[in-house]
């Protein structure tokens, strides 16, 4: 049985009083993870295909397999690149939520995944790729016109000034080892790192001739990924203006900006090895 709590709130006008009415049923027992009955099996030929099967009576699973989440009790999922993965299980039992996890290894890549070259440009797949400021530019960070400029063109901040802001030596690493991982190695902005999170890219063009898609980050950001004019709010959504083996150029409009030539911020990076 599931606990049910019903509150009936009765308020008298100008008085503000309320009377809670509570109806309870005793909850059932918590099923411990040691009692779970489930299997996670690699396909014997293509081990990037996983078969998930929960056979635990009266327990519902949610499976987080790094590339997505499924609430199907029996499902087939694909692990996109080789690596060691931790499958995280959130189980709803009669007495509450119980967590469990299992580690699996994948040795083959899903041939249908990450076919666009931009994924390799950005992350070098599972091996990872580290980016730093592009110090060959007059100013690799600053602001300019949204959907107009292709680099900082109003306030252009050079490497000396970036060092003065405490972000000149920061680094960020993208990789596809067990997920879409982004690690920011930061001295202080938005906080002292490393700050680990995830990322995704969408290669749908927003404005023809200006961008090539979008980059989204979760629980982390890029180097100096803040809106300086908006209380240093962390930026998690970027337009990709250029992405190849040697350059990554990003832009993000200030909150509320949608029109051409509104204020936007720009970031210009190069691979660390370059």
Task: Give the role of each language-model region.
Residues 1-40, 95-104, 108-122, 272-274:
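Bacterial Sec-dependent N-terminal signal peptides
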Residues 46-56:
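A short beta-strand segment in extracellular, disulfide-stabilized domains
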Residues 60-78:
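Surface-exposed, flexible coil segments in extracellular/virion-facing regions
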Residues 69, 94-101, 260-262:
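Short, exposed coil/turn segments at beta-strand boundaries within extracellular/luminal domains
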Residues 72-94:
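Solvent-exposed segments in extracellular or luminal domains encompassing
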Residues 133-178:
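Short, solvent-exposed loop/hinge segments that bridge or flank secondary-structure elements
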Residues 160-243:
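Contiguous, well-ordered beta-strand patches that form the walls/edges
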Residues 194-202, 227, 245-274:
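Edge beta-strand at a domain terminus
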């Amino acid at each position: 049985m599931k606990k049910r709590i019903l509150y009936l709130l009765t308020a008298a006008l100008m008085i503000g009083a309320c009377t809670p009415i509570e109806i309870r049923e005793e909850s059932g027992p918590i099923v411990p993870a040691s009692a779970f009955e489930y299997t996670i099996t690699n396909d014997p030929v293509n081990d990037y295909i996983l078969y998930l099967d929960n056979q635990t009576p009266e327990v519902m699973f949610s499976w987080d397999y790094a590339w997505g989440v499924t609430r199907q009790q029996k499902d087939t999922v694909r692990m996109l690149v080789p690596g060691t993965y931790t499958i995280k299980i959130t189980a709803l039992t009669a007495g509450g939520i119980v967590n469990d996890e299992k580690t699996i290894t994948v040795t083959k890549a899903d041939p249908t995944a990450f076919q666009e070259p931009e994924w390799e440009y950005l992350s070098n797949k599972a091996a990872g790729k580290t980016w730093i400021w592009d110090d060959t530019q007059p100013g690799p960070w600053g602001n300019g016109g949204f959907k107009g400029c292709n680099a900082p063109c109003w306030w252009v901040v050079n490497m000396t000034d970036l060092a003065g802001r405490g972000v000149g030596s920061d680094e960020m690493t993208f990789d596809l080892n067990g997920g879409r991982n982004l690690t920011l190695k930061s001295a202080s902005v938005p906080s002292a790192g490393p700050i680990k999170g995830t990322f995704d890219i969408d290669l749908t063009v927003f404005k023809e001739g200006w961008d090539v898609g979008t980059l989204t980050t979760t629980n982390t950001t890029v180097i100096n990924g803040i809106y300086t004019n908006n209380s240093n709010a962390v930026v998690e959504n970027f337009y990709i203006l250029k992405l190849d083996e040697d350059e990554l150029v990003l832009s993000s409009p200030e909150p509320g900006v949608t029109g051409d030539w509104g204020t936007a911020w720009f970031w210009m990076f190069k691979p660390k090895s370059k």
